[in-house]
Regions:
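Helix-adjacent hinge/juxtasegments
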Residues: 62-100
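Short, contiguous alpha-helical
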Residues: 5-20, 24-69, 111-161
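Active-site rim elements
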Residues: 2-7, 79
């Protein structure tokens, strides 16, 4: 059976690798979007990090998470800062994977919620994958096809490690 450890480490690796690839592209790609101009590449990149930051805090018992103090990246240097911060956040998630399937209660914009830690871990992994695909789709829409998601699947992670 696939392990949570593998899923989390794959997520951390895929986040870092895809963000690194985006950092090598012209900064104009940060303003690309698929359909909704509210969801530009730069917005999605920050959103993944902010959501992961919240998930990490929930898993550590925080009821109301402290917001991640970063802005949308405007250039390669900004992306590199975001890469480092997201890697650290993902490491917190990896380090907290053995908390057991406990109930976690936290406040979101939808009010107070209680979920099992397994639900939070599952949502976190899915959320990051969903939005990495959205980033690549926005680039693809504008004929930037250098990032192939098949290079960042679980198989590729296993081969690389």
């Amino acid at each position: 059976m696939i392990s949570l450890d593998l899923l989390l480490k794959h997520m951390q690796w895929a986040n870092k690798e895809i963000y690194s690839e985006v950092s090598e592209l012209d900064s104009k790609v940060l303003d690309y979007f698929v359909v909704d101009p509210e969801w530009k590449v730069k917005t999605i990149m920050l959103h993944i990090a902010k959501a992961s930051n919240n998930y990490a805090q929930y898993l550590q018992g925080a009821t109301e998470p402290t917001s991640l103090d970063l802005e949308e990246p405007l250039n390669s240097d900004d992306i590199k800062i975001l890469i480092e911060k997201l890697y650290e956040i993902d490491q917190v998630l990896i380090d907290n994977q053995n908390i057991g399937d406990v109930d976690l209660t936290f406040i979101t914009r939808r009010g107070e919620q209680t979920h099992k830690s397994s639900t939070v871990f599952s949502q976190m992994v899915f959320h990051a994958a969903e939005h990495r695909a959205q980033i690549v789709a926005a680039l693809d829409k504008h004929n930037f096809r250098s990032i192939n998601l098949d290079n960042y699947d679980v198989w590729s992670y296993i081969r690389a490690h």
